[in-house]
A protein has these predicted regions:
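Charge-rich, low-aromatic oligomerization/scaffolding segments with amphipathic character
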Residues: 7-23, 129-132
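Conserved structured catalytic cores and adjacent interaction surfaces
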Residues: 32, 76-176, 278
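Long, charged amphipathic helices and adjacent flexible linkers at domain junctions
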Residues: 23-72, 187-199
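C-terminal tails and terminal domains of large nucleic-acid-associated
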Residues: 238-244
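Short, small-residue-biased leader/transition segments that mark boundaries at the very start
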Residues: 3-5
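Internal, active-site/partner-interface "lid" segment
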Residues: 150-228
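Gly-rich Lys/Arg/Thr-decorated short loops/hinges at beta-loop-alpha junctions or inter-strand turns
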Residues: 34-37, 60-69, 77-94, 202-214
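C-terminal edge-of-domain segments
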Residues: 26-29, 270-286
Length: 286
């Protein structure tokens, strides 16, 4: 997974609501993806290989805490990392694809964040503990863990940040923003199992709503459509559909079309090429 650090250089004000801000960011990303696609594929592969080996050699240098507030955020996948960067990430630390960052990784990232108070957004329930264990290990700045359990929660928390509010006010605003998001995921079974009343075969597609298994055995596109349908209600105004490394652009657009037809015109839907491992789709519904 990758960790991204956001300093306060890009203050997000309350006036920018999740929907409109994310729309702008996603338009920028689409533009970037278009430019990247225009590069010759061979060039791009060579460039990425060089970048990857460069990243492995770099270690984070500690910096003195001069800003008031900063962020460390955890995410996996180039597109998701780009999205967190677009939201103001100054630096990105890479771990392995399915490897959760250690407490040590988080401490290193915190020390490389030039802020007196550093918010940590784990964005995964399995990383919350590692983040909390980092708190007593850093003495020259304060760490506040906002226990985000999913990528959509992390994005929403980040977007509710108010540079004029105190650290404690922000911590509670960010947590409540995170809790107002529904998260859907579509993944695949790593092995045969029985779970939540389902008999699951290795490789089966699994659709989950807020962590609860709901659908087994559809195609990823069909599954994410069912998940979206289950999470939408009459108050839904914004949906972000983030597709992973196993999904083609055609499949992503087909999923978008199905969800758009179901949601109708009143719902703002955005598609993001997240490139994340493990999850075919991550869905944010607000």
């Amino acid at each position: 997974s990758e960790m991204c650090i956001r300093d306060r250089g890009v203050a997000l004000t309350k006036a920018l609501e999740f929907g409109s801000l994310l729309t702008v960011k996603i338009e920028n990303m689409k533009e970037q993806h278009k430019k990247a696609a225009e590069l010759n594929n061979a060039n791009r592969a060579a460039y990425e290989a060089a970048q990857a080996s460069k990243e492995e050699k770099e270690t984070l240098k500690p910096v003195s805490p001069e800003e008031e507030l900063g962020f460390v955020s955890v995410a996996a996948g180039d597109g998701l990392r780009a999205l967190f960067e677009e939201l103001g990430c100054a630096q990105v630390v890479s771990g392995g694809q399915t490897m959760n960052p250690s407490t040590e990784d988080i401490v290193e990232a915190v020390l490389a964040t030039p802020a007196k108070t550093v918010f940590v957004l784990p964005n995964n329930k399995n990383i919350i503990l590692a983040a909390e264990q980092a708190v007593p290990l850093v003495t020259d700045r304060k760490i506040i863990v906002v226990p985000t359990r999913t990528i959509p929660q992390g994005l929403s928390a980040l977007l509710s940040f108010d540079p004029d509010a105190s650290a404690d006010e922000n911590a509670s605003a960010m947590l409540s923003a995170a809790e107002n998001v529904s998260t859907g995921t579509v993944t695949f079974a790593a092995r045969d199992s029985e779970f939540g009343g389902f008999k699951i075969k290795e490789g089966d597609t699994m659709g989950m709503t807020n962590g609860k298994l709901e659908f087994v055995g559809d195609t990823p596109v069909r599954s994410v459509y069912k998940v979206a349908k289950a999470l939408m209600n009459k108050h839904t105004s914004f949906i972000t559909l983030i597709y992973g490394e196993g999904i083609t652009e055609e499949e992503a657009n087909e999923a978008l079309r199905l969800i758009k037809n179901k949601a109708g015109d009143g719902v703002d839907i955005n598609l993001v090429n997240g490139g994340q491992p493990v999850y075919y789709f991550i869905l944010s519904v607000e």
